[in-house]
């Protein structure tokens, strides 16, 4: 008689129980990931919305209906933007090993950047941060075939990372051409990150020791990495303690506007 057939039923049950327990633990871990990420994605727009609505109320009480209407418009844009972000987030979590599906459109990249920076101006100001957009490369053509939601989330998370963790007073966004590609760069004049900590800042739930304004969830740069990988791009960090950070996203040129996995 083989060892398999002679094994006690209790041993089989224990093995099945262990397998089921491992499965349940994976499901719980995935659920916790989803909850943490959802909290991360909801916290940012709620803060931005509260700023816009508070200003809308103040201006309306002062009789400035035009300015109040503009504040409400910005609040509506914030809601739309973060609804798209949550959709992207759910796809990343549902298929952790898969590449995010891009839906490319031909968009005016500087215009997208300017709109996002404008929507974050109040939050930056409330933190004492000045933002600047630089696009002085004469070879940089504004129109690019890319996924606008993914690109917006990449920049949004890089900016929010600078707002929350760097202790910066100035953040600069640069657009430029590269060989067969184009680059999006976010530079701050904050506290910087030690070389030994730089690789880990891109990992899920990692919060670098340099963070000076709250622990955060450690998800923003992980989301950036996943989306940049989907674009067949790369992200690099140049920093040292006391010198600030320069995050550079390099995205290959793409001529097609198809869905891409």
What residue ranges belong to the model's regions?
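Short helix-loop "hinge" at the ATP-lid/N-box region of the Bergerat-fold HATPase_c
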Residues: 162-163
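Short conserved segment of the HATPase_c
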Residues: 193-205
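Glycine-rich ATP-lid/hinge loop adjacent to the conserved G-boxes
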Residues: 206-216
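Short alpha-helical segment of the dimerization/phosphotransfer core of two-component systems
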Residues: 75-82
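Short alpha-helical Gxxx[C/S/T] motif in the catalytic ATP-binding
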Residues: 220, 224
């Amino acid at each position: 008689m083989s060892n398999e057939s002679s094994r006690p039923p209790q041993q089989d049950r224990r093995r099945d129980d262990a397998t089921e327990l491992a499965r349940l633990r994976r499901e719980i871990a995935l659920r916790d990931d989803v909850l943490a990420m959802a909290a991360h994605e909801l916290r940012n727009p709620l803060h931005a919305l509260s700023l816009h609505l508070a200003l809308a109320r103040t201006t309306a009480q002062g009789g400035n209906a035009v300015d109040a209407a503009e504040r409400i418009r910005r609040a509506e844009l914030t809601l739309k933007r973060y609804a798209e972000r949550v959709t992207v987030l759910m796809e990343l979590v549902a298929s952790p090993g898969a590449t995010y599906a891009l839906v490319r459109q031909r968009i005016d990249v500087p215009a997208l950047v300017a709109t996002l920076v404008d929507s974050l101006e109040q939050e930056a100001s409330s933190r004492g941060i000045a933002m600047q957009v630089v696009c002085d490369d004469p070879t940089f053509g504004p129109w690019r075939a890319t996924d606008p939601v993914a690109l917006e989330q990449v920049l949004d998370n890089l900016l929010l990372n600078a707002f929350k963790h760097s202790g910066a007073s100035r953040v600069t966004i640069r657009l430029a051409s590269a060989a067969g590609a184009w680059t999006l760069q976010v530079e701050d004049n904050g506290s910087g990150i030690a070389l030994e900590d730089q690789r880990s800042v891109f990992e899920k739930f990692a919060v670098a020791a340099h963070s000076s304004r709250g622990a955060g969830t450690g998800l923003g740069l992980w989301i950036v990495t996943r989306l940049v990988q989907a674009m067949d791009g790369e992200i690099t960090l140049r920093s040292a303690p006391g010198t600030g950070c320069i995050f550079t996203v390099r995205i290959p040129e793409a001529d097609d506007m198809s869905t891409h996995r």
